[in-house]
Amino acid sequence: EFPLTPTTKTSEDSFMKSHGRAVQPFVPDAKVIFDPTGKAKTSLEEIGKYTINMYRESPYITDANTSMPELELGSAHKLKKFCPTIHKLMHHMLGNGNEEFERFINWLAFIYQTKEKAQTAWVLTGIQGTGKGLFYTEILKPLFGDQHVPMRTLENLEEKFNIYMRSAMFLVLDEFHMGSSKERKLADKLKNIITERTVVVRAMHNNQIEQKSYTNVIVLTNKVDAVSLEQTDRRYNVAPRQEHKLIDVHPEIIDELSNISKELLNFAGVLNNFKYQERLVKTVFQNQAKETMRNLAMEMSEQFAMHILTGNLEYFIDILDIETNNI
């Protein structure tokens, strides 16, 4: 497919000639949008009012097995019966956290059904080989569509141009570590991507445009201190860290990976019928994994201030034991 970018009549003539097509005497203007909700559709019926929606529904969404049972928070684990390989991979990737698995499925179901922004993000952390990459390539991208699930690195996020955000339902940040950023305002930029209802898209040699944002963020990382978290953070869910490789715990997974594409229609049906709780989509889960990452990502001065504010005097015991003549 060719990208939809603004162009001139001269460029269009050259394009047609390059591909052995007849040059058109008149090419009508069209408004190019991205709206996965279906509220705005592609319309080429009336010249002067042409609209092209860049959203493309994946075959798995189109042909989802909607006869799947209606699950809800607390019973999401029952999808194991219909998508055993997908369940095995995702549960392991989420650090075997049962409640985190339930909440992650609830979060995905909200996005699947509404195609809207959740305004909260997930951080998935663990050593290499825990299934994070497989989840992206074998489940998330095929299910929601390759062009709607871009993967980018920290360096990409620091760049000025972000055309990939134009049609992104998910932004997956790979090998992410906020502390390695050269950009001071990276935390604020990421907060805006997660929560703001609009996004400014900048493409090279084109004017920037502001459009509605449908982007949800998933962070994949090996780092234990990947994201700097405020004490009152309301944006990030953190799954328990997985310290064991998927293949070591489930050696049979090698022979089962080919089942994922067959299970995706059932998984799409589960998400389609899931009775999601929007309140738990919009509010983050305060678990031990998040508290651990918050503490590990803190600078020493932040730790000092936090322990004073919380009255944790034990933190200062080592300091009181220091011999003053050694200072």
For every predicted segment, state its role.
Residues E1-G74:
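Intein modules and their embedded homing endonuclease domains
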Residues T42-F176, R184-A187, N237, L271:
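P-loop NTPase catalytic core of nucleic-acid-dependent motor ATPases
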Residues F161-R166, R202-L220:
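AAA+/SF3 P-loop NTPase mechanochemical coupling elements
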Residues S167-M169, S213-N216, Q231-Y236:
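Short glycine-/polar-rich loops that comprise or flank the Walker A/P-loop
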Residues L186-I209:
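Conserved catalytic/switch belt of AAA+ P-loop NTPases
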